[in-house]
Amino acid sequence: MVWKRTISAKALEKAKSAAVKVDDKVIFIANVNGNLYAMDAVCSHARCILGKLDEEKLTVRCYCHLALFDLRTGQMLEPPYVAPDAPKEKLGLKTYQIRDNNGWIEVDV
């Protein structure tokens, strides 16, 4: 395990979500009602950065072609509108362990 510091817990609590650079990766992190989540922030379809967090459904939508991902598992729930027959089971995103360590959000990469 290699825990990497990202942003302050206060900043994430205020923003609710953020795309952060960790080494050579961009990771989407979120704080939903005190629960922390982390997954790849680059859509597996066209390499766009994910953006729209739905706190109620725990999903994240890609801004480019509207693919929808489960924040907990990284599974693609809805394919991009430009590729409705895309194999959802093959286009999921990697999730990461995440923690609050003394006021800093850390991701295990």
Curated annotation (Swiss-Prot):
Binding sites annotated in the UniProt record for [2Fe-2S] cluster: C43, H45, C62, H65
Sequence ranges assigned to domain Rieske in this UniProt record: 3-107
TM annotation in the entry: none
Subcellular localization, as worded in the UniProt entry: Cytoplasm
One Pfam family of this chain: Rieske
Reported cofactor(s): [2Fe-2S] cluster
Protein known as: Sulredoxin
Organism: Sulfurisphaera tokodaii (strain DSM 16993 / JCM 10545 / NBRC 100140 / 7) (Sulfolobus tokodaii)
